[in-house]
Amino acid sequence: RKLGYLDGCRKFGIKVAEEQKIDCFMSVGGGSEAAEQLMAQSELPEALFTTNDAIALGIMRKLQEKKVAVPEQISILSYGGNEWNEWVTPSLTTLRLPIEEMSSACVQLLNTMLTTGEWIPISRIFQLELEYRESCTKTEK
């Protein structure tokens, strides 16, 4: 996810400063700790992109505690598509993973491997769906 994000940024000429790449546990607590690191920097970025919804929730909670307004001061977008994304305040913008399609592809691949006895390396790209909600502002860029 991270590599795909950075590759996309390069393709569109978006520079991501090294200090803006924050690694954390993939949990609400990890997101809270990442928000602390982010706020220790001299300036907040215009937007954040997290590798899962739990991290985004932790960041949003910590920012709200510190009176940083989402999306007025910073927009947040995540990977995932958890059902609670529409119930948090502000509701979370996310790239929904096609879990059913991904699961089906895994089962089919496993079945083929068990049937043939062959290991089949595979690379597959799945289409994501943007669920635009309140955590992001639209820009004119």
What are these regions (language model features)?
Residues 1-141:
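Bacterial carbohydrate/catabolite-sensing allosteric modules
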